Amino acid sequence: MTMNVQPQALFAALIATFLAAASLPAVAHQAPVHEHTQLVPIPDYDLPYGPAGGAAALQAANAFLATFDETTKAQFMFELDAQERSEWSNLPAGIVNRIGISVGELSDDQRKQLFEFLASSLSEDGYRRVMDVMAAEAFLSTDSRAKRLKWNPENYWLSFYGTPSADAPWGWQFGGHHLGLNLSIDGGNVKTMSPSFVGTEPAVFTLDGIDYEAVVDMHHAGHAVFASLNDDQQAAADAGSVPEDIRTGPGKDGFVPPIIGLSTAGMTDEQKTLLLDAIAKWVTIQPDENAARRMTDIEAELDQISFAWTGGNDVNSPVYMRIQGPTLIIELLSTGGNVGQSASGLGHYHTIYRNPTREYGR
Protein backbone atom coordinates (compact mmCIF):
# COMPACT_ATOMS: atom_id res chain seq x y z
CA MET A 1 0.00 0.00 0.00
CA THR A 2 1.14 3.60 -0.47
CA MET A 3 2.50 5.52 2.48
CA ASN A 4 2.12 9.12 3.66
CA VAL A 5 0.35 10.41 0.61
CA GLN A 6 -3.17 11.60 -0.07
CA PRO A 7 -5.23 9.70 -2.69
CA GLN A 8 -5.35 12.70 -5.04
CA ALA A 9 -1.58 12.99 -5.10
CA LEU A 10 -1.14 9.23 -5.34
CA PHE A 11 -3.16 8.63 -8.47
CA ALA A 12 -2.36 11.91 -10.19
CA ALA A 13 1.35 11.11 -9.97
CA LEU A 14 1.13 7.35 -10.31
CA ILE A 15 2.46 6.95 -13.82
CA ALA A 16 2.02 10.37 -15.35
CA THR A 17 5.49 9.74 -16.71
CA PHE A 18 7.92 6.90 -16.53
CA LEU A 19 10.92 8.00 -14.51
CA ALA A 20 13.79 9.45 -16.47
CA ALA A 21 16.61 7.18 -15.44
CA ALA A 22 18.98 10.07 -14.88
CA SER A 23 16.79 11.47 -12.12
CA LEU A 24 17.73 8.69 -9.69
CA PRO A 25 21.13 7.35 -8.71
CA ALA A 26 21.97 4.11 -10.54
CA VAL A 27 22.12 1.59 -7.72
CA ALA A 28 20.76 -1.84 -8.60
CA HIS A 29 21.32 -2.65 -12.27
CA GLN A 30 23.25 0.43 -13.43
CA ALA A 31 20.58 1.04 -16.05
CA PRO A 32 21.29 3.59 -18.78
CA VAL A 33 19.07 6.60 -19.43
CA HIS A 34 15.93 5.62 -21.35
CA GLU A 35 13.32 7.65 -23.17
CA HIS A 36 9.85 6.65 -22.00
CA THR A 37 6.35 7.05 -23.36
CA GLN A 38 4.21 9.38 -21.30
CA LEU A 39 0.99 8.02 -19.85
CA VAL A 40 -2.24 9.79 -19.07
CA PRO A 41 -2.37 10.21 -15.26
CA ILE A 42 -4.44 7.49 -13.64
CA PRO A 43 -7.49 9.06 -12.02
CA ASP A 44 -8.63 8.78 -8.44
CA TYR A 45 -11.06 6.04 -7.50
CA ASP A 46 -14.28 7.43 -8.92
CA LEU A 47 -17.71 5.84 -9.24
CA PRO A 48 -19.69 7.62 -11.97
CA TYR A 49 -22.16 4.71 -12.19
CA GLY A 50 -22.94 4.30 -8.50
CA PRO A 51 -21.48 1.90 -5.90
CA ALA A 52 -18.97 -0.60 -7.25
CA GLY A 53 -20.52 -3.94 -8.15
CA GLY A 54 -22.21 -5.83 -10.94
CA ALA A 55 -24.66 -3.09 -11.91
CA ALA A 56 -22.04 -0.35 -12.06
CA ALA A 57 -19.57 -2.65 -13.83
CA LEU A 58 -22.18 -3.36 -16.51
CA GLN A 59 -22.76 0.33 -17.21
CA ALA A 60 -19.05 1.08 -17.24
CA ALA A 61 -18.32 -1.90 -19.51
CA ASN A 62 -20.93 -0.80 -22.02
CA ALA A 63 -19.60 2.76 -21.97
CA PHE A 64 -16.10 1.45 -22.65
CA LEU A 65 -17.24 -0.93 -25.39
CA ALA A 66 -19.20 1.84 -27.11
CA THR A 67 -15.91 3.55 -28.00
CA PHE A 68 -14.85 0.69 -30.33
CA ASP A 69 -15.99 -0.57 -33.71
CA GLU A 70 -17.07 -4.20 -34.10
CA THR A 71 -13.79 -5.30 -35.66
CA THR A 72 -11.75 -4.00 -32.75
CA LYS A 73 -14.13 -5.41 -30.14
CA ALA A 74 -13.72 -8.85 -31.67
CA GLN A 75 -10.06 -8.73 -30.64
CA PHE A 76 -10.87 -8.64 -26.92
CA MET A 77 -14.37 -10.11 -26.57
CA PHE A 78 -14.68 -13.91 -26.31
CA GLU A 79 -17.26 -16.58 -25.57
CA LEU A 80 -17.99 -17.10 -21.87
CA ASP A 81 -16.15 -20.43 -21.71
CA ALA A 82 -13.44 -19.62 -24.23
CA GLN A 83 -10.14 -21.38 -23.66
CA GLU A 84 -8.38 -18.01 -23.74
CA ARG A 85 -9.90 -17.20 -20.37
CA SER A 86 -7.61 -19.67 -18.61
CA GLU A 87 -4.47 -18.75 -20.54
CA TRP A 88 -3.46 -15.76 -18.42
CA SER A 89 -0.01 -15.31 -16.91
CA ASN A 90 1.84 -13.24 -14.32
CA LEU A 91 5.07 -13.19 -16.34
CA PRO A 92 6.36 -10.11 -18.20
CA ALA A 93 4.97 -9.41 -21.66
CA GLY A 94 8.43 -10.04 -23.11
CA ILE A 95 8.12 -13.68 -22.04
CA VAL A 96 4.41 -14.45 -22.52
CA ASN A 97 2.14 -12.87 -25.14
CA ARG A 98 -1.26 -11.67 -23.97
CA ILE A 99 -4.74 -11.53 -25.44
CA GLY A 100 -7.14 -8.62 -25.17
CA ILE A 101 -6.59 -4.91 -25.67
CA SER A 102 -3.73 -3.18 -23.89
CA VAL A 103 -3.58 0.14 -22.09
CA GLY A 104 -1.05 1.25 -24.69
CA GLU A 105 -3.53 0.75 -27.54
CA LEU A 106 -6.17 3.03 -26.05
CA SER A 107 -6.96 6.66 -26.78
CA ASP A 108 -7.08 9.15 -23.92
CA ASP A 109 -10.86 8.83 -23.69
CA GLN A 110 -10.73 5.04 -23.81
CA ARG A 111 -8.15 4.98 -21.01
CA LYS A 112 -10.46 7.14 -18.93
CA GLN A 113 -13.30 4.71 -19.62
CA LEU A 114 -11.03 1.76 -18.74
CA PHE A 115 -10.15 3.15 -15.33
CA GLU A 116 -13.80 3.99 -14.67
CA PHE A 117 -14.62 0.37 -15.49
CA LEU A 118 -11.95 -0.93 -13.09
CA ALA A 119 -13.16 1.41 -10.34
CA SER A 120 -16.76 0.31 -10.91
CA SER A 121 -15.73 -3.35 -10.81
CA LEU A 122 -13.43 -3.34 -7.75
CA SER A 123 -13.40 -2.04 -4.22
CA GLU A 124 -11.35 1.08 -3.53
CA ASP A 125 -8.69 -1.15 -1.99
CA GLY A 126 -8.73 -3.43 -5.03
CA TYR A 127 -8.36 -0.47 -7.38
CA ARG A 128 -5.43 0.82 -5.31
CA ARG A 129 -3.72 -2.58 -5.49
CA VAL A 130 -3.99 -2.58 -9.29
CA MET A 131 -2.50 0.91 -9.42
CA ASP A 132 0.34 -0.15 -7.11
CA VAL A 133 1.22 -3.05 -9.43
CA MET A 134 1.25 -0.69 -12.41
CA ALA A 135 3.38 1.80 -10.46
CA ALA A 136 5.92 -0.96 -9.77
CA GLU A 137 5.97 -1.69 -13.50
CA ALA A 138 6.68 1.98 -14.22
CA PHE A 139 9.54 1.77 -11.73
CA LEU A 140 10.90 -1.32 -13.50
CA SER A 141 10.75 0.48 -16.84
CA THR A 142 13.98 2.31 -15.92
CA ASP A 143 15.86 -0.99 -15.62
CA SER A 144 18.34 -2.03 -18.30
CA ARG A 145 16.30 -5.21 -18.93
CA ALA A 146 13.03 -3.34 -19.46
CA LYS A 147 13.07 -3.27 -23.27
CA ARG A 148 13.75 -7.01 -23.58
CA LEU A 149 11.19 -8.02 -20.95
CA LYS A 150 8.69 -5.31 -21.97
CA TRP A 151 8.41 -3.90 -18.45
CA ASN A 152 6.01 -1.10 -19.24
CA PRO A 153 2.80 0.02 -17.45
CA GLU A 154 1.10 0.23 -20.85
CA ASN A 155 1.42 -3.56 -21.08
CA TYR A 156 -1.72 -4.52 -19.17
CA TRP A 157 -4.61 -6.08 -21.08
CA LEU A 158 -8.39 -6.17 -20.69
CA SER A 159 -10.64 -8.86 -22.16
CA PHE A 160 -14.32 -9.77 -21.78
CA TYR A 161 -15.95 -13.21 -21.70
CA GLY A 162 -19.60 -13.32 -22.63
CA THR A 163 -21.50 -10.14 -23.47
CA PRO A 164 -21.97 -7.78 -20.51
CA SER A 165 -25.60 -8.21 -19.51
CA ALA A 166 -27.89 -7.71 -16.52
CA ASP A 167 -29.46 -11.15 -16.85
CA ALA A 168 -26.76 -13.44 -18.27
CA PRO A 169 -23.35 -14.44 -16.93
CA TRP A 170 -20.25 -12.64 -18.15
CA GLY A 171 -16.75 -11.97 -16.92
CA TRP A 172 -13.67 -9.91 -17.45
CA GLN A 173 -9.93 -10.28 -17.09
CA PHE A 174 -7.32 -7.59 -16.54
CA GLY A 175 -3.69 -8.45 -16.24
CA GLY A 176 -0.06 -8.27 -17.20
CA HIS A 177 3.18 -8.58 -15.26
CA HIS A 178 2.36 -9.57 -11.66
CA LEU A 179 -1.38 -9.14 -12.16
CA GLY A 180 -4.21 -11.41 -13.25
CA LEU A 181 -7.73 -10.47 -12.12
CA ASN A 182 -10.65 -12.69 -13.17
CA LEU A 183 -14.06 -11.49 -12.03
CA SER A 184 -17.34 -13.19 -12.90
CA ILE A 185 -20.73 -11.49 -12.88
CA ASP A 186 -24.18 -13.08 -13.03
CA GLY A 187 -27.64 -11.68 -12.47
CA GLY A 188 -26.21 -8.21 -12.06
CA ASN A 189 -23.97 -9.22 -9.15
CA VAL A 190 -20.28 -10.05 -8.81
CA LYS A 191 -20.14 -13.78 -8.03
CA THR A 192 -16.44 -14.56 -7.70
CA MET A 193 -12.94 -13.22 -8.31
CA SER A 194 -11.39 -16.67 -8.63
CA PRO A 195 -8.69 -17.07 -9.72
CA SER A 196 -6.90 -13.77 -9.12
CA PHE A 197 -3.17 -13.12 -8.90
CA VAL A 198 -1.65 -10.02 -7.30
CA GLY A 199 2.10 -9.64 -7.03
CA THR A 200 4.77 -7.00 -7.32
CA GLU A 201 8.42 -6.38 -7.99
CA PRO A 202 9.63 -4.32 -6.28
CA ALA A 203 7.41 -4.13 -3.20
CA VAL A 204 9.01 -1.12 -1.53
CA PHE A 205 10.03 1.68 -3.88
CA THR A 206 9.82 5.39 -4.61
CA LEU A 207 8.28 6.60 -7.86
CA ASP A 208 8.12 10.29 -8.72
CA GLY A 209 8.62 11.23 -5.07
CA ILE A 210 5.86 8.93 -3.81
CA ASP A 211 6.72 6.02 -1.49
CA TYR A 212 4.99 2.70 -2.14
CA GLU A 213 4.58 -0.50 -0.19
CA ALA A 214 2.79 -2.92 -2.51
CA VAL A 215 1.53 -6.28 -1.13
CA VAL A 216 3.55 -5.70 2.07
CA ASP A 217 0.36 -5.39 4.16
CA MET A 218 -0.67 -8.88 3.00
CA HIS A 219 2.68 -10.26 4.15
CA HIS A 220 2.43 -8.51 7.52
CA ALA A 221 -1.16 -9.70 8.03
CA GLY A 222 -0.06 -13.30 7.53
CA HIS A 223 2.91 -12.90 9.84
CA ALA A 224 0.64 -11.42 12.52
CA VAL A 225 -1.24 -14.73 12.55
CA PHE A 226 1.98 -16.73 12.87
CA ALA A 227 3.36 -14.43 15.58
CA SER A 228 0.19 -14.93 17.65
CA LEU A 229 0.73 -18.71 17.82
CA ASN A 230 2.40 -20.48 20.73
CA ASP A 231 5.43 -22.73 20.17
CA ASP A 232 3.40 -25.89 19.59
CA GLN A 233 1.07 -24.11 17.18
CA GLN A 234 3.99 -22.61 15.26
CA ALA A 235 5.54 -26.05 14.90
CA ALA A 236 2.25 -27.37 13.51
CA ALA A 237 1.95 -24.40 11.15
CA ASP A 238 5.46 -24.82 9.72
CA ALA A 239 5.22 -24.90 5.92
CA GLY A 240 8.72 -26.29 5.48
CA SER A 241 11.12 -24.85 2.94
CA VAL A 242 10.08 -21.91 0.79
CA PRO A 243 9.10 -23.23 -2.68
CA GLU A 244 10.32 -21.76 -5.94
CA ASP A 245 6.84 -20.39 -6.61
CA ILE A 246 3.25 -20.61 -5.44
CA ARG A 247 1.63 -24.00 -6.10
CA THR A 248 -1.70 -22.84 -7.55
CA GLY A 249 -0.68 -19.99 -9.83
CA PRO A 250 -1.38 -19.50 -13.55
CA GLY A 251 -1.89 -22.74 -15.45
CA LYS A 252 -2.90 -24.63 -12.30
CA ASP A 253 -6.69 -24.40 -12.63
CA GLY A 254 -8.32 -27.39 -10.94
CA PHE A 255 -5.24 -28.31 -8.91
CA VAL A 256 -5.82 -28.57 -5.15
CA PRO A 257 -2.61 -29.14 -3.17
CA PRO A 258 -2.47 -31.34 -0.06
CA ILE A 259 -3.47 -29.67 3.20
CA ILE A 260 -0.52 -28.50 5.28
CA GLY A 261 -0.19 -26.47 8.45
CA LEU A 262 -2.22 -25.79 11.56
CA SER A 263 -5.96 -26.45 11.66
CA THR A 264 -7.88 -23.34 12.57
CA ALA A 265 -10.02 -25.48 14.86
CA GLY A 266 -7.13 -25.37 17.33
CA MET A 267 -6.84 -21.58 17.34
CA THR A 268 -8.12 -19.15 19.94
CA ASP A 269 -10.82 -16.66 19.02
CA GLU A 270 -8.21 -13.89 18.84
CA GLN A 271 -6.07 -15.95 16.48
CA LYS A 272 -9.06 -16.73 14.29
CA THR A 273 -9.83 -13.01 14.08
CA LEU A 274 -6.27 -12.31 12.89
CA LEU A 275 -6.63 -15.06 10.29
CA LEU A 276 -9.89 -13.60 9.01
CA ASP A 277 -8.21 -10.19 8.83
CA ALA A 278 -5.47 -11.72 6.68
CA ILE A 279 -7.96 -13.49 4.40
CA ALA A 280 -9.87 -10.23 3.96
CA LYS A 281 -6.80 -8.62 2.37
CA TRP A 282 -7.55 -10.72 -0.73
CA VAL A 283 -11.32 -11.08 -0.53
CA THR A 284 -11.93 -7.32 -0.33
CA ILE A 285 -10.25 -6.66 -3.66
CA GLN A 286 -13.71 -7.30 -5.10
CA PRO A 287 -16.70 -5.01 -4.47
CA ASP A 288 -18.42 -5.03 -1.10
CA GLU A 289 -21.53 -6.72 -2.53
CA ASN A 290 -19.63 -9.98 -2.94
CA ALA A 291 -16.80 -9.52 -0.44
CA ALA A 292 -19.22 -9.40 2.51
CA ARG A 293 -21.00 -12.57 1.38
CA ARG A 294 -17.71 -14.30 0.74
CA MET A 295 -16.32 -13.47 4.17
CA THR A 296 -19.52 -14.80 5.77
CA ASP A 297 -19.11 -18.08 3.87
CA ILE A 298 -15.44 -18.35 4.86
CA GLU A 299 -16.22 -17.68 8.50
CA ALA A 300 -18.81 -20.48 8.42
CA GLU A 301 -16.13 -22.99 7.34
CA LEU A 302 -13.36 -21.47 9.44
CA ASP A 303 -12.70 -24.59 11.53
CA GLN A 304 -12.01 -26.51 8.29
CA ILE A 305 -9.29 -24.07 7.20
CA SER A 306 -5.57 -24.62 7.70
CA PHE A 307 -2.78 -22.06 8.04
CA ALA A 308 0.85 -22.70 7.06
CA TRP A 309 3.79 -20.31 7.30
CA THR A 310 7.54 -20.21 6.78
CA GLY A 311 9.65 -17.07 7.18
CA GLY A 312 9.67 -13.81 9.05
CA ASN A 313 8.26 -10.31 8.73
CA ASP A 314 11.06 -8.81 6.61
CA VAL A 315 9.95 -7.63 3.18
CA ASN A 316 13.21 -8.63 1.56
CA SER A 317 13.44 -12.24 2.77
CA PRO A 318 12.05 -15.66 1.73
CA VAL A 319 8.48 -16.25 2.99
CA TYR A 320 5.73 -18.72 2.12
CA MET A 321 2.14 -18.76 3.40
CA ARG A 322 -0.81 -20.95 2.50
CA ILE A 323 -4.37 -20.59 3.81
CA GLN A 324 -6.56 -23.43 2.58
CA GLY A 325 -10.07 -24.73 3.16
CA PRO A 326 -12.94 -26.37 1.25
CA THR A 327 -13.63 -23.26 -0.85
CA LEU A 328 -10.46 -21.25 -0.34
CA ILE A 329 -6.81 -21.25 -1.34
CA ILE A 330 -4.61 -18.24 -0.65
CA GLU A 331 -0.88 -18.36 -1.21
CA LEU A 332 1.81 -15.73 -0.65
CA LEU A 333 5.44 -16.11 -1.68
CA SER A 334 8.25 -13.62 -1.05
CA THR A 335 11.60 -14.21 -2.72
CA GLY A 336 13.22 -10.87 -1.91
CA GLY A 337 15.72 -9.05 -4.10
CA ASN A 338 16.71 -5.60 -5.30
CA VAL A 339 15.58 -4.21 -8.65
CA GLY A 340 15.44 -0.97 -10.57
CA GLN A 341 17.53 2.12 -9.99
CA SER A 342 16.69 2.96 -6.38
CA ALA A 343 17.91 1.54 -3.09
CA SER A 344 14.22 1.45 -2.10
CA GLY A 345 13.49 -1.07 -4.87
CA LEU A 346 13.16 -4.03 -2.53
CA GLY A 347 11.11 -7.20 -2.46
CA HIS A 348 9.32 -9.53 -4.86
CA TYR A 349 5.91 -11.09 -4.12
CA HIS A 350 3.57 -13.57 -5.78
CA THR A 351 0.10 -14.14 -4.31
CA ILE A 352 -3.00 -16.02 -5.48
CA TYR A 353 -6.63 -16.20 -4.38
CA ARG A 354 -8.79 -19.11 -5.48
CA ASN A 355 -12.17 -20.60 -4.73
CA PRO A 356 -11.75 -24.09 -6.23
CA THR A 357 -15.52 -24.51 -6.37
CA ARG A 358 -16.16 -21.30 -8.36
CA GLU A 359 -13.31 -20.90 -10.83
CA TYR A 360 -14.28 -18.31 -13.45
CA GLY A 361 -17.79 -18.32 -11.96
CA ARG A 362 -18.50 -21.92 -12.98
Please name every model-derived segment.
Residues 24-28:
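Sec/Tat signal peptide C-region and signal peptidase I cleavage site
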Residues 29-123, 127-362:
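A cross-kingdom marker for long, charged
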Residues 2-13:
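Bacterial N-terminal signal peptides that target proteins for export
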Residues 12-22:
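Bacterial N-terminal signal peptides
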